[in-house]
Amino acid sequence: MNYNDKSLSALKLGQKTEYKSEYDPTLLQPVPRKLNRDGLGITEQQPFDRGADVWTCYELSWLNENGLPQVAIADVAIDFRSENLIESKSFKLYLNSFNQTKFASLEQVEQTLAKDLSQCASGQVSVKVYKLSAYTQQPIVDFAGECIDEQDIQIDSYEFSNEHLASVAEGEVVEETLVSHLLKSNCLITSQPDWGSVQIHYVGKKLNREKLLRYLVSFREHNEFHEQCVERIFTDLIQFTQPEKLTVYARYTRRGGLDINPFRSNFESVPQNLRMARQ
């Protein structure tokens, strides 16, 4: 990726910013997916053909027609085929612009979000806005699968390398789900830490747990957006393990009232958006 690309240098990330409280869709800033995908060899149908960037928006507020503040939580799913991902700070600033703006109904807010986000992403975006009473009924969940974090191994290098995956696939073909809560990368622009959990569901030769964990830990000083990290994990696993089926799903902790949960697969549909303990 060219980190000096004009589409990145214009981002609000890392810059002193004015917080607007009147509705302004121009605050949204796109980042072309191709900046990262070209280097990974990703096309519209390869190596994954389904997925979304699932966002949870916890700080959503507006005024009703009487001027009384309203609060809600929104689930947003940006289709993986969209031309752009949406830069997170611009998303936060955009949501803040609803704060002193009157909307006739929750449905109008939902429709406005879907329209603006679809335009910024240049692709399909689905939005569901929930009253707090509805959202509080949702459970806190954990990823299904075998957690690989409790290994007695020594690590002294935290520089990203996909070479940790060399010969990671060994033995018989299995179907299994592996989980790690040790995923940590850094924002591409600001280098702020991004903390996440990752779930890998695959059909293929059995993966060596130690090598896989070393690979995931090597993201610890790596600078890339959430969505790009998940796509890199997916393409690296395809390259080194050649599985028959693969899903990579990460759920990151929230920042600025937003969490981002990228899902990529070549055989499964996007799951329900259920938060985990750190979210």
Swiss-Prot record:
- Domain of life per record: Bacteria
Compartment list:
Cytoplasm
Residues annotated as binding NADPH are S88, K89, R255, G256
Gene Ontology annotations for the cellular component aspect, listed alphabetically: cytoplasm
The enzyme's main class, written as a single word, is oxidoreductase
A single Gene Ontology molecular function, please?
A: preQ1 synthase activity
Pathway field of the UniProt record reads: tRNA modification; tRNA-queuosine biosynthesis
Principal subcellular localisation of the protein: cytoplasm
Q: What keywords appear on the UniProt entry?
A: Cytoplasm, NADP, Oxidoreductase, Queuosine biosynthesis
Q: How does it assemble?
A: Homodimer.
Q: Which PANTHER family is this protein grouped with?
A: NADPH-DEPENDENT 7-CYANO-7-DEAZAGUANINE REDUCTASE (PTHR34354:SF1)
Entry protein name: NADPH-dependent 7-cyano-7-deazaguanine reductase
